[in-house]
Amino acid sequence: GSVDLIYSSLAIQWCQNLPQFFAECQRVLKPGGCLQISTLVPGTLTELNSAWALVDDAVHVNAFDELGVVKAAAKSAGLKVSSLVDVPHVVSYLKLKDLMADLKGIGAHNMNQGRSQGLLGKSKYQKLIASYEAYRVDDRLPATYQVLYGSFNNG
């Protein structure tokens, strides 16, 4: 390998093949090189997921890899785990439309099988707003991002 450090921030949750990602990182890292990642894990957008579950049976929130899956993929690629910690980060909004605009603004989209293929109608959106209101605290709507921070070494 020829690279001392690889840094990936909130990108690998979009990878279709996590073992291949880690294998490629291991291949390009110098011996002793370091990979630093942050990625989303289960617990992310639980409020939104639960609110949608009261509206319909479609899958609206991405399924994220468990910490153990990330760890196993890195180890199987020959990387040594230096540290892995997942931390909840809560962002709050005045209105659900603000959360939805943030998600759209960062380019987040539903990657799941079983996702709804149609447009969101006004009636469903009103039901979603009503079900998300159950999470309102101190006049704000929370959105939890469960972020995994990982550090790995090559060799």
Predicted regions and their residues:
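Conserved catalytic/acceptor-binding region of the Class I
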Residues: G32-L96, I106-Q117
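Conserved Class I S-adenosyl-L-methionine
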Residues: K80-G155
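Amphipathic, non-transmembrane alpha-helical secondary structure
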Residues: P19-A23, L54, K97
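A short glycine-rich, Lys/Arg-flanked "PGG" loop and its adjoining helix->strand segment in the class I
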Residues: P19-C34
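A short acidic, Gly/Pro-enriched loop at the edge of an enzyme's catalytic core
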Residues: G1-I6
